[in-house]
From Swiss-Prot:
SUPFAM superfamilies: ARID-like. The lineage of its organism: Eukaryota, Fungi, Dikarya, Ascomycota, Saccharomycotina. It is found in: Nucleus. This is SWI/SNF chromatin-remodeling complex subunit SWI1. PROSITE patterns: ARID (PS51011). Residues 1-65, 88-112, 213-235, 581-592 have a biased composition (Low complexity). Keywords: Activator, Amyloid, DNA-binding, Metal-binding, Nucleus, Prion, Transcription, Transcription regulation, Zinc, Zinc-finger. [SWI+] is the prion form of SWI1. [SWI+] is the result of a conformational change of the cellular SWI1 protein that becomes self-propagating and infectious. This conformational change generates a form of SWI1 that assembles into amyloid fibrils. [SWI+]-aggregates sequester soluble SWI1, resulting in reduced growth on carbon sources other than glucose, reminiscent of a partial loss of function of the SWI/SNF chromatin-remodeling complex. [SWI+] can be cured by GdnHCl and by deletion of the molecular chaperone HSP104, which is required for [SWI+] propagation. Present with 92 molecules/cell in log phase SD medium. Involved in transcriptional activation. Component of the SWI/SNF complex, an ATP-dependent chromatin remodeling complex, which is required for the positive and negative regulation of gene expression of a large number of genes. It changes chromatin structure by altering DNA-histone contacts within a nucleosome, leading eventually to a change in nucleosome position, thus facilitating or repressing binding of gene-specific transcription factors. GO terms for biological process: cellular response to amino acid starvation; chromatin remodeling; DNA-templated DNA replication; positive regulation of mating type switching; positive regulation of transcription by RNA polymerase II; regulation of transcription by RNA polymerase II. Residues 593-605 have a biased composition (Basic residues). Residues 236-250 have a biased composition (Polar residues).
Length: 1314
């Protein structure tokens, strides 16, 4: 009998089976095993089964396909490992609760050898052809199962039936549950079978079937095809009955191919009827041993390869000995088990050898790939690290990222500190902005993200960088970056920086690998600890067991979870306990009393499912850990091999290959020495000098200050003394607690002004001060020239010289002198001589002066230098009247210019040194001018006036002598503040100074832009300045204050202003006659006025300066701002009231005292022609205007007359309001200031109207001047307003008088028009 050949020569086997079922849990297990053997014949077996199932019916469909073509043993053992993803028949169970249902299933199988089952007759059955059992199903894609596949069981390693047999797993009956033992010993009247969770268990049912086969095989049948023993064509295919109920078969049924062909032809009509079973309503439960089943949730195991069919009552059964057959089968199973183990060990050895060979073959290939493509290895490592990081918990990921960030910050700060040390700028502390420390690493990375410092500066994104870092002062942040981080950024771009970056990257990668290793080791330790805890908890849990049967509590260490250990010895007493009665029609059944079932608490489906999921997760985790360990080992091996390869490669001799030169880069040797000097060392010395430069002390740290000593230092020619004195005075004058009194030390002001004049003279002539050549000094022996005070001293010296020469006189010595002695003629005695009187020699003064002048050791010294405007190189070519806002724009452009010279130091350029000293002097004068006592002395000081005049000339006429625009604007600010403080007592020295002051004041206004003209002024056609805005600054108000104060002093200031504004000849001026340089001043003044008016060729614009001054004063009055602020204009008036008052006063002075026809009586005759003729005859000879400027001012687009009238009404309303909450009414000075402003407004309107009429009468241009004046809107008050004003008792009488005069003028104009 051949057990390994599965060939079947039967052509058609048609079986009809009818069975009776009880109220039990029935399971239909449909498995199809296709063994593609070319030697097999195709058999078509169709069987039809009718069954009624009243409980859960489960359809389990599995397909196991084994490849043939190898030896017989390999047909039994399939070494292919289990892959759950490849199992196409892993279907879930479908529970259908059907009460008293008759289900008919028809299944067709292709290429399937259907054995004939030999069954102990539990019920009569008829065998017919064309029908098969209800659980045969071909799981091919062309044929679908009639049942819904919904099985949740996992296929246990997807073993084929041959492999199940090859494993030879036999279980002891003592390990079976109680119900299974009852079925084992209770005979064949029970239609229920137990479900065992083990795939490789041979049940006692199988042994009983083996005995029945041996008995049936010995009996003879009338059919010619029946044989007493199985031949080679009769296949015996045992299988594991793992389902709880297979097609309602009894426990002693067996799958076999052993059947006679005549048995298929014996069918009767009674085969379709159901025969009741004696053990009806026998409810048996399936006991599942879940400890030994780790992969299935239910007890249905889908490893059935054939379908048992009920044998009809007329089956030919033989009466051979069952014990002999069983012993043969047991011996065969033992042999198969030994062969299987040996084969499995051999296969394992072969697989290990193949794996070792593959690894050895892959190592050199991997080395080559690593050498050829290092970038790929690097990217692969990064991907591995990224995948490992993603698999970690978020908390671990955050912790690892924090460690990496800290390490990266540490490396950055070390590199930055080292770079600062190399540049001799050690980073002592982290910089702060607003008591907040700056994170240099974040700042550097953010700037690099924007493209670098140059790109951020080019695109002006420093404010955005500061906003990202939440810092308000971006300019300070920019300076910090340029001072500390910009050299580091340039260092990182160099070759050394690139190498340093690569080393940092390698270090960070190694650091990340070490972190990942530590984390993986911790996870492995935690996983092993959790696994041990799970195993201990599982072993301590109770498992259901039948009475008298002992189940092991824990699995053996060598066995897998869910596999029952196989008993090596089959019990011999098993045959004695089985009583089988084989009859042709009926089979006797032995009734065994059932013991009481022990109540065991079953686990719910949820608990079982949770346990299964936990086990699967644990297995997956272990598998991942093993894979990670293998990867790390491979990486370590690869690195070691690569290092060894690199070492060996370096040992080999270098081979140079000729190649085409591409992208040739010549070698560059950096010059460290220039003419033998180390440039780096010299730069370090310079940096040390700058860092050690002393910072000037503050005012409290200076101690006692001697102003007289400071004035003497200013007069010296020593640069250090001068700078120290200037710095001390600047710090002292800027301190509000200290006051410099010029009353006690007036020489201090003289020293400052004289030093300033000398510096301005040197600056204008490009003379470098404080630099003397050795040729300027004259050396002479101190004893060579002796100067005698008296003649007696000289004579005494000669006597001593003769004594020193031993009193020997030479006879012809010209130096000898004859001494005359008076004697008495009678006696001859010497007469007594009177004591000689010492007399001073009379020295010639001219000779002394000539001697001193010719002496090289004595220099001529003048107290004051010549005025700058009279120097030969100071001829005026242009007046630089740059507006204030334009100056600010120029300063900004100058700062943004990369080639600017604003950072040049005085030690580098002598011109910068002079500019700094002049700026210090102007600031000192500005600070000390705020004192009243000092302002009186300053306004009368001749040296200060001269210094101001020279400084104004250079700033306005020749500003190119200064180094930058910022210095020029600072000089203008200092001058306008100083003049504002001293102008109420200042007497202007010359007309040129007066003109320069006017140009200085006008330069702080904002002129209108004329697109038709090249200049910013319209000329005398309209007002040339825009109304002053609050956000423009306060320097325009200082200009208005200067003009108002200078106009208050009539002689000589007002006369100078009148001659300049009216563009008259200043030769007859008394004050100019007193000047020594009158002729030069006249020429310069005419030249300057022509430059300002641009009237070299014609006289059309002779009064541009007058128009600009009046326009500037009108622009200081905020008419539009007050009128637009209708809610509460009192605040604006309170802020601007002093400026408004000064502007109105200055305009009234110009209109009443400077404009001509001021003393004439204004009369309007009824006949305009007569008046015109009279005016022509009485025309003033000094009138040289070609335009009616007062009418131009009234009729301008700003509508000055209407604005002044509305301003007067608003001030009246403020004064007459009943509420006293306004700020103006609470102040005392407003009681006088506001009425004066009101009077000035009305008076100015009246004067402008009168002057307009007078100018027009003198010009004889337009006879309809009265109509034009009357047509100006809102120029005169209405009758109602005049009536309300006159009836208001709270209005000041002076205001009423001015309104009355204006009203009378209105009536006169209207009368003449009528």
């Amino acid at each position: 009998m051949d057990f390994f050949n599965l060939n079947n020569n039967n052509n058609n086997n048609n079986t009809t089976t009818t069975t009776t079922t009880t109220n039990n849990n029935n399971t239909n297990n449909n498995n199809t095993n296709n063994n593609n053997n070319p030697a097999n014949n195709t058999n078509n077996n169709n069987s039809t089964g009718h069954s009624s199932n009243t409980n859960n019916n489960t359809n389990n469909n599995n397909t196991n396909t084994g490849a043939s073509g190898v030896d017989d043993f390999q047909n039994f053992f399939d070494p292919k490992p289990f892959d759950q993803n490849l199992d196409s028949n892993n279907n879930n169970s479908n529970s259908n609760n059907n009460d008293n249902n008759n289900s008919n299933t028809v299944a067709s199988s292709t290429n399937f050898t259907s054995p004939t089952a030999v069954v102990n007759n539990a019920a009569p059955a008829n065998v017919t052809g064309g029908k098969a059992a209800n659980f045969i199903q071909n799981q091919s894609p062309q044929f679908n199962s009639p049942y819904d596949s919904n099985n949740s069981n996992t296929n246990l390693n997807s073993l084929s039936p041959q492999a199940i047999l090859a494993k030879n797993s036999i279980i002891d009956s003592s390990n079976l549950p109680l119900q299974a033992q009852q079925q084992l010993y209770g005979g064949n009247n029970n239609n229920n079978s137990t479900g065992i969770a083990n795939d490789n268990v041979i049940t006692p049912h199988f042994i009983t079937n083996v005995q029945s086969i041996s008995q049936n095989s010995s009996s003879s049948t009338p059919n010619t095809n029946s044989n007493s023993t199985p031949n080679a064509n009769q296949q015996f295919l045992p299988f594991n009955n793992s389902a709880s109920n297979n097609g309602n078969l009894t426990s002693n049924q067996l799958i076999s191919n052993y059947a006679a062909s005549n048995s298929m032809d014996r069918s009767s009509s009674a085969s379709n009827e159901f025969v009741p079973n004696t053990s009806d309503n026998n409810n048996n439960s399936n006991n599942h041993n879940m400890r030994n089943n780790s992969n299935n949730k239910t007890s249905n195991n889908n490893n059935v390869t054939a379908v048992p069919a009920a044998t009809p009552a007329n089956t030919n059964n033989s009466t051979s000995n069952a014990n002999t057959v069983f012993s043969e089968r047991a011996a065969m199973f033992a042999a198969l088990q030994q062969k299987q183990q040996q084969r499995f060990q051999a296969l394992q050895q072969q697989q290990q050898q193949q794996q070792n060979q593959q690894q050895q073959n892959q190592q050199p290939q991997q080395q080559q790939q690593q050498q050829q493509n290092p970038k790929f290895l690097q990217s692969q490592r990064q991907q591995q690290q990224r995948s490992i990081l993603q698999s970690l918990n978020p908390a671990l990921q955050e912790k690892i990222s924090t460690e990496l960030n800290n390490k990266q910050y540490e490396l950055f700060m070390k590199s930055l500190i080292e770079n600062c040390k190399k540049r001799n700028m050690p980073l002592q502390s982290i910089p702060e902005i607003g008591n907040r420390k700056i994170n240099l690493f974040y700042l550097y990375m953010l700037v690099q993200k924007f493209g670098g410092a140059d790109q951020v500066t080019r695109t002006q994104q420093w404010s955005m960088v500061a906003q990202r870092l939440q810092i308000s002062d971006y300019q300070q942040l920019e300076s910090i970056y340029f001072r500390i981080l910009l050299p580091y950024e340039r260092h990182m771009i160099s070759q050394e920086g690139i190498k340093e970056t690569q080393a940092k990257r390698i270090f960070l990668q190694q650091f990340l690998q070490e972190l990942l290793k530590k984390v993986q080791q911790q996870q492995q330790a935690a996983a092993l600890a959790n696994a041990n805890n799970n195993i201990n908890s599982a072993s301590s849990a109770p498992t259901p067991a039948a009475p008298g049967a002992s189940v092991p509590a824990t699995a053996a260490p060598g066995t897998e979870a869910g596999i029952v250990p196989v008993s090596a010895n089959t019990p011999k007493s098993l045959n004695s306990n089985i009583n089988i009665n084989v009859n042709n029609n009926n089979i006797g059944q032995q009734q065994v009393k059932k013991p009481r079932k022990q109540r065991v608490k079953k686990k719910t489906k949820k608990e079982l499912e949770l346990e299964r999921k936990e086990r699967e997760d644990f297995q997956k985790r272990q598998q991942k850990l093993l894979e990670d360990q293998q990867r790390q080992q491979k990486l370590l091996l690869e690195t070691k091999l690569r290092q060894q390869y690199e070492i060996e490669l370096k040992k080999l001799p270098k081979v140079y290959k000729r190649s085409i030169v591409r992208n040739y880069k010549p070698l560059i040797n950096r010059l460290k020495h220039y003419n033998g000097y180390d440039i780096n060392y010299i730069s370090k010395i310079g940096e040390k000098i700058d860092s050690n430069k002393p910072i000037f002390l503050f005012a409290p740290e200076l101690g006692a200050i001697n102003l007289h000593a400071l004035s003497m230092s200013l007069q010296s020619k020593n640069l250090g003394e001068i700078n120290t004195a200037l710095n001390t005075l600047l710090v002292t004058s800027a301190d509000s607690n200290l006051k410099i009194s010029l009353v006690k030390y007036p020489e201090l002001l003289d020293s400052l002004a004289i030093l300033g004049m000398n510096l301005l003279s040197n600056l204008s002539q490009n003379v470098v001060p404080y630099h003397r050549n050795t040729s300027d000094y004259y050396y002479e022996d101190a004893g060579s020239n002796q100067y005698y005070v008296t003649q007696h001293d000289k004579m005494v010296d000669k006597i001593f010289e003769k004594v020193n020469n031993n009193a020997t006189l030479t006879p012809n010595d010209s130096n000898d002198e004859k001494v005359t002695i008076l004697v008495d003629s009678l006696t001859g005695n010497q007469l007594p001589t009177p004591t000689p009187t010492e007399m001073e020699p009379d020295l010639d003064t001219e000779c002394f002066i000539s001697m001193q002048s010719t002496s090289p050791a004595v220099k001529q010294w003048d107290l004051l230098p010549e005025p700058i405007r009279f120097l030969p190189n100071q001829f005026p070519l242009k007046i630089h009247r740059t507006p204030y806002l334009t100056s600010l724009k120029k300063i900004k452009d100058e700062i943004d210019d990369p080639f600017t010279k604003i950072n040049t130091r005085g030690a580098e350029d002598p011109k910068v040194l002079i500019n700094d000293q002049l700026s210090t002097i102007s600031m000192i004068l500005r600070n000390i001018s705020f004192s009243d006592n000092n302002s009186r002395i300053m306004s009368r000081n001749f040296y200060l006036k001269r210094f101001i005049s020279d400084l104004l000339w250079l700033v306005l006429i020749h500003p190119e002598n200064f180094t930058c625009n910022r210095k020029i604007l600072n000089f203008k600010k200092d001058l306008v503040i100083v003049l504002s403080n001293i102008s109420h007592l200042l007497e202007i020295a010359s007309s040129i100074d007066c003109l320069l002051i006017l140009i200085l004041v006008i330069s702080f206004g904002q002129p209108k832009l004329n697109p038709m003209a090249s200049s910013s002024s319209f000329g005398s056609e309209s007002l040339t300045f825009n109304e002053f805005q609050l956000q423009w600054g306060k320097y325009q108000t200082f200009g208005v204050d200067i003009l108002a104060k200078l106009f208050s002093l009539e002689k000589p200031n007002l006369n100078y202003f009148k001659s300049i504004l009216l563009n008259k000849n200043t030769g007859n001026n008394l004050y100019d006659r007193n000047s020594n340089n009158n002729h030069k001043d006249k020429k310069l003044l005419r030249r300057l006025l022509n430059l300002y008016n641009d009237n070299n060729k014609n006289n059309n614009n002779r009064h541009n300066l007058l128009n600009d001054v009046v326009s500037f004063l009108f622009s200081a009055i905020p008419l539009q701002q007050v009128l637009s602020q209708s809610a509460d204009p009192s605040l604006l008036i309170d802020q601007f009231s002093p400026v408004i008052s000064q502007s109105l006063t200055s305009i009234l002075v110009i209109v009443q005292k400077i404009l001509p026809l001021s003393n004439e009586v204004f009369e309007i005759s009824e006949n305009n022609s007569d008046s015109n003729s009279n005016n022509n005859g009485n025309k003033d000879s000094s009138f040289n205007f070609n335009k009616n400027l007062p009418f131009v001012w009234l009729s301008s687009e700003e509508n000055i007359g209407s604005g002044l009238l509305k301003l007067s009404e608003i001030i009246l309303n403020i004064n007459n309001s009943t509420s006293k909450n306004t700020l103006l009414q609470q102040q005392n000075y407003s009681k006088v200031l506001l009425p004066s402003i009101n009077i000035s407004c009305v008076q100015l309107i009246k004067c402008l109207v009168e002057k307009s009429i007078c100018f027009e009468n003198c010009l004889n241009n337009d006879p309809e001047i009265l109509k034009k004046i009357a047509s100006i809107p809102n120029l005169f008050p209405t009758d109602l307003e005049i009536f309300q004003l006159f009836t208001n008792p709270s209005v000041d009488i002076q205001i009423i008088n001015q309104y009355q005069l204006l009203y009378n003028l209105k009536n006169d104009i209207l009368t003449n028009l009528e």
